[in-house]
């Protein structure tokens, strides 16, 4: 890695202070891009820049940016003189002057448009300067985060001051000082999270909470505080996050306020204090550790924080405080899992060994002891580690190792976000992507970067795990009741009813049976003891399930099925984390719970140490499938083993979704890889068996095309398989050569029926998949299998626009190489033909309206069909492909997310729209994976259990379910706006 100590030669210009830079993988291409840009500039400016870039590191940095960061290279090219000015500046002084000058200009501005332009110019110049200082090693990472925070705080202050001065001009506000209208206005803004701690990351949203004191304000007499301050807050968010030709300043997140789904964006201090006193939760206590007044009436804010202090900092380590801490840890364990740390796809923020664990390590101990030890009440994470060390709560070694890891991981996070100005935290999912990133980060190879990353992740994970050695289970303590007393014990019945069981009599009888040890699994004393020890945690987990009573029944079936499963029960007794995971499976996802109850051997997958490691790729899945099938004696046994393999794969992937250890995209790919492997295997098996009965036709070829979710590699736990079967043969000899000969089309129709039966026939182990072949040419009116020539003719002459939209997801998953190539050429020809954009837009919009009329689009939680839902995003991606593939064939991809990336890169989709659609698609995929796993019918939040709501909130990166719904409404509104602007205006 090209790096050394951060540059600290004060007074030197930036170009002379770089001490590190990217490793450029393709220098010729990067040089070409750089020289093309320089050639476009005015000669004297180009000469000046060439001189500045003559030395190694400045040029290396710019080449790395040109190669890996479209966002930063756009900033460089947008204003070459600004870039030159930055290279010649002393960065610290330049940033301070930039903020100061912008403040003066905003103060003098006379229109909102001018303010928005000035703030966006500030952000763009600061973003480029800070990135150069980070990439070039000029500033250490915490100076980078402080600089980012300074820009954000200054922008909020400037915007709010402008708005308040405008309100004073309108006569709605009577400030004590016209030049300082914040003083005494009653409204104040709390910076939360990393902004509050002065640790903002490069492309971070800013988390703000806006409060106002209704008794202390400078409003005109006839102005009501609530609507006034709500309007000001909405205007503040608009000034900062609306996208204009100059970009945006910061995305603003106001959802950390109390009960965001039902409260206004500006909230009175009285209402907030009442909420925190009555309903405040552990995560809100932890969040308030970092709260800081960043703008507005400082005196009112300080008074509010003083009143809030007892909520955050408890004076006594009472039972409830300890329970809160254990609950925080338990939730992280259950939802994030206990993975073997991976490199590809690893989330450096919330993944194992990541930034969140360091923050949690510090915040947990601050919550425990901060009430009695005021010196622990600090905001920055590294400062918290320092005071915890000084107070003997942690060792110097822990502080030093966690500090080093934190700084490293924050730099990784920044570099990820610099690539496209997106708030991402996960490394690329593939080794090639990680290699590209590693070079941008300054490493020469993926291996060296991976070695350092894994070292730090494992260090963090170790310290985090040791923190709770006093109670490694993190389980809650329940009231002492006799769980084996049966339904005649009033206290037990009251307790079970209080936990939320609808049929406490049934539950009590079941518990009595368990503890009586009558099941075969309890035949040994050791197993009975292990089971008794973890029963309170199990009951607690089931009580918070989506369907608690059903989860108890499922677990009872599971125990009865464990005829020889004493080893598993002993394992559960020794590993409470696994108990929590099983309780989550049985509670939140009844479908998985029923599978586990019917097939206890599925538990073996959870014991496998590879379970929480990297997801198996196609090659490994193929090897596992072959091992599963290798000694199958009969066709029926072969089908049974295929079903077992499919169920085990679904169970393990589903459990990883629930535990939060795989992303929706990884899960969708994994489900698709499993299905693809099974389809290919069944295709080969049925081909051989059918030929044994009916022979073969000369020159015969068959192929299976995946469509829909399988084609897009976006499957869920409940996806069926959308397939098309194509065939070809020698038309001069159409008869098969077997004893029961069949001719041409009839042969392949019977073959297709046999293939479908292999998937859908029900054995003792259920069905493999439901098969849907309605996307074949002519749909239900057409034959089950299509001749290749008929398929080509149909796509060229008869297919409707919607059929070509569906064809964008077509993927040949089982065929000979030569036949595959012929099919892919037909698909490409169909997709790449010139089309009328207006006609296609009209067809797509009409199709969307037809779906809305049939399916409805008003249900927020119909993530596919809702206005602004996944159909809108898929239709945009498909529209862009059909319209532009003729001239830009590289836009084609089966994945909507990839299409959006290509479309942005090719300049046919604005960056702002692409970001909105990508973020929305990822959110919808995350939530859809869980809903398909946990809910068999329409999702109704008011009927859902706490477990499921918590899983959904976690998946949506929201503090609670109400905040998730608020985010979902906002997201769907933004997506529908983009859809309308592209297809209906």
Curated annotation (Swiss-Prot):
Record-annotated membrane-spanning stretches: none
Pfam families for this protein: GlnD_UR_UTase, GlnE
Region (Adenylyl removase): 1-472
Keywords attached to this entry: ATP-binding, Magnesium, Multifunctional enzyme, Nucleotide-binding, Nucleotidyltransferase, Transferase
EC number assigned by the record: 2.7.7.89, 2.7.7.42
GO molecular function, one term: ATP binding
InterPro entries cross-referenced by the UniProt entry: GlnE, GlnE_rpt_dom, NT_sf, PII_UdlTrfase/GS_AdlTrfase
Cofactors named for this entry: Mg(2+)
Catalytic activity of the protein: [glutamine synthetase]-O(4)-(5'-adenylyl)-L-tyrosine + phosphate = [glutamine synthetase]-L-tyrosine + ADP; [glutamine synthetase]-L-tyrosine + ATP = [glutamine synthetase]-O(4)-(5'-adenylyl)-L-tyrosine + diphosphate
Region named Adenylyl transferase: 477-985
GO cellular component, one term: cytosol
Gene Ontology process terms (BP): regulation of glutamine family amino acid metabolic process
Top EC class of this enzyme: transferase
Record bears the keyword Nucleotidyltransferase: yes
Classification via SUPFAM superfamilies: Nucleotidyltransferase, Nucleotidyltransferase substrate binding subunit/domain
Function in brief: Involved in the regulation of glutamine synthetase GlnA, a key enzyme in the process to assimilate ammonia. When cellular nitrogen levels are high, the C-terminal adenylyl transferase (AT) inactivates GlnA by covalent transfer of an adenylyl group from ATP to specific tyrosine residue of GlnA, thus reducing its activity. Conversely, when nitrogen levels are low, the N-terminal adenylyl removase (AR) activates GlnA by removing the adenylyl group by phosphorolysis, increasing its activity.
HAMAP family cross-referenced by the UniProt entry: GlnE
Protein family (similarity comment): Belongs to the GlnE family.
PANTHER family cross-referenced by the UniProt entry: BIFUNCTIONAL GLUTAMINE SYNTHETASE ADENYLYLTRANSFERASE_ADENYLYL-REMOVING ENZYME (PTHR30621:SF0), GLUTAMINE SYNTHETASE ADENYLYLTRANSFERASE (PTHR30621)
Listed name of the protein: Bifunctional glutamine synthetase adenylyltransferase/adenylyl-removing enzyme
Organism per entry: Bradyrhizobium sp. (strain BTAi1 / ATCC BAA-1182)
Lineage: Bacteria, Pseudomonadati, Pseudomonadota, Alphaproteobacteria, Hyphomicrobiales
This protein's encoding gene: glnE
């Amino acid at each position: 890695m090209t790096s050394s100590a951060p540059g600290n030669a004060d007074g030197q210009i930036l170009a002379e202070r770089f001490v590190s830079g990217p490793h450029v993988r393709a220098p010729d291409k990067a040089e070409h891009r750089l020289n093309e840009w320089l050639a476009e500039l005015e000669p004297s400016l180009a000469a000046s820049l060439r001189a500045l870039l003559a030395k190694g590191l400045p040029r290396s940095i710019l080449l790395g940016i040109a190669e890996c960061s479209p966002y930063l290279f756009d900033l460089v090219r947008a204003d070459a003189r600004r870039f030159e000015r930055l290279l010649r500046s002393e960065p610290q002084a330049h940033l301070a002057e930039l903020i100061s000058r912008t403040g003066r200009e905003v103060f003098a501005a006379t229109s909102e448009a001018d303010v928005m332009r000035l703030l966006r110019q500030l952000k763009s110049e600061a973003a480029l300067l800070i990135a150069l200082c980070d990439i070039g090693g000029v500033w250490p990472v915490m100076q980078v985060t402080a600089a980012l925070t300074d820009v954000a705080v200054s922008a909020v202050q400037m915007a709010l001051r402008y708005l308040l001065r405008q309100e004073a001009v309108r006569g709605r506000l009577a400030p004590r000082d016209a030049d300082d209208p914040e003083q005494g206005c009653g409204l104040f803004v709390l910076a939360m999270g990393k902004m509050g701690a002065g640790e903002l990351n490069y492309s971070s949203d800013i988390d703000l909470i806006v409060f106002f004191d209704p008794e202390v304000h400078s409003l005109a007499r006839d102005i009501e505080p609530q609507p006034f301050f709500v309007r000001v807050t909405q205007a503040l968010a608009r000034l900062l996050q609306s996208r204009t030709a100059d970009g945006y300043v910061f995305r603003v997140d106001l959802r950390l306020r109390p009960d965001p789904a039902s409260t206004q964006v500006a909230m009175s201090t009285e209402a907030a204090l009442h909420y925190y006193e009555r309903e405040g939760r552990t995560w809100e206590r932890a969040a308030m550790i970092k709260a800081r007044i960043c703008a507005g009436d400082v005196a009112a804010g300080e008074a509010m924080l003083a009143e809030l202090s007892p909520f955050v900092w408890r004076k006594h380590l009472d039972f409830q405080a300890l329970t809160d801490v254990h609950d925080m840890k338990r939730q992280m364990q259950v939802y994030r899992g206990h993975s073997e740390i991976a490199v590809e796809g690893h989330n450096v923020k919330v993944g194992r060994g990541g930034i969140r664990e360091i923050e949690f390590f510090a915040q947990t101990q601050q919550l425990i002891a901060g009430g009695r030890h005021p010196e622990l009440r600090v905001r920055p994470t590294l400062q918290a580690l320092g005071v915890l060390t000084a107070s003997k709560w942690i060792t110097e070694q822990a502080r030093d190792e966690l500090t080093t890891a934190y700084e490293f991981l924050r730099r990784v996070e920044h570099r990820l976000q610099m690539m496209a100005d997106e708030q991402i935290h996960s490394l690329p999912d593939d080794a090639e992507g990680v290699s590209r990133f590693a070079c941008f980060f300054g490493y020469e190879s993926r291996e060296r970067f991976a070695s350092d990353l894994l070292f730090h992740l494992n260090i963090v994970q170790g310290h985090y795990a040791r923190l709770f050695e006093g109670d490694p289970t993190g389980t809650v303590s329940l009231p002492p009741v006799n769980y084996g007393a049966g339904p005649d014990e009033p206290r037990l019945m009251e307790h079970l009813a209080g936990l939320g069981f609808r049929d406490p009599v049934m539950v009590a009888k079941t518990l009595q049976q368990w503890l009586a040890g009558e099941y075969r699994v309890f035949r040994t004393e050791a197993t009975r003891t292990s089971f008794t020890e973890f029963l309170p945690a199990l009951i607690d987990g089931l009580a918070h399930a989506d369907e608690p009573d059903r989860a108890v029944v499922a677990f009872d079936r599971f125990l009865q099925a464990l005829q020889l499963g004493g080893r598993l029960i002993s394992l559960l007794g020794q590993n409470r984390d696994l108990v929590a995971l099983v309780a989550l499976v049985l509670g939140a996802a009844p479908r998985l719970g029923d599978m586990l109850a019917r097939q206890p051997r599925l538990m073996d997958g959870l014991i496998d140490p590879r379970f929480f490691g990297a997801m198996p790729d196609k090659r490994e899945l193929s090897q596992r499938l072959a091992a599963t099938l290798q000694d199958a004696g009969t066709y029926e046994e072969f089908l049974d083993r295929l079903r077992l393999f499919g169920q085990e794969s679904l169970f393990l992937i589903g459990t990883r979704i629930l535990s939060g250890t795989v992303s929706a995209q990884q899960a969708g790919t994994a489900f698709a890889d499993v299905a693809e492997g099974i389809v290919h295997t069944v295709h080969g098996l049925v081909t051989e068996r059918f030929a044994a009965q009916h022979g073969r036709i000369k020159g015969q070829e068959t192929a299976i095309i995946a469509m829909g979710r399988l084609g897009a590699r976006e499957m869920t736990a409940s996806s069926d398989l959308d397939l098309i079967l194509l065939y070809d043969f020698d038309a001069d000899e159409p008869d098969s050569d077997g004893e029961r000969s069949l001719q041409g089309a009839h042969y392949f129709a019977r073959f297709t029926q046999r293939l479908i039966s292999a998937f859908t026939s029900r054995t003792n182990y259920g069905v493999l998949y439901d098969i849907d072949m309605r996307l074949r040419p002519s749909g239900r009116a057409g034959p089950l299998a299509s001749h290749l020539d008929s398929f080509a003719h149909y796509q060229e002459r008869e297919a409707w626009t919607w059929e070509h939209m569906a064809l964008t997801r077509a993927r040949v998953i089982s065929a000979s190489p030569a036949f595959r190539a012929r099919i892919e050429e037909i698909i490409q020809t169909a997709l790449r033909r010139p089309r009328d954009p207006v006609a296609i837009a009209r067809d797509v919009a009409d199709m969307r309206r037809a779906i809305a009329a049939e399916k409805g689009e008003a249900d927020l939680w119909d993530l596919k069909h809702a206005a602004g839902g996944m159909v809108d995003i898929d239709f945009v991606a498909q529209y862009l492909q059909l319209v532009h593939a003729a001239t830009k064939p590289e836009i084609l991809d089966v994945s909507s997310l990839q299409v959006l990336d290509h479309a942005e890169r090719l300049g046919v989709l604005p960056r702002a729209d692409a970001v909105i659609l990508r973020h929305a698609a990822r959110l919808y995929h995350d939530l859809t994976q869980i809903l398909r796993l946990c809910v068999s019918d329409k999702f109704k939040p008011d009927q859902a259990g706490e477990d499921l709501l918590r899983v959904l909130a976690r998946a949506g990166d929201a503090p609670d379910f109400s905040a998730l719904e608020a985010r979902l409404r906002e997201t769907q509104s933004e997506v529908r706006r983009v859809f309308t602007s592209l297809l209906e205006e």
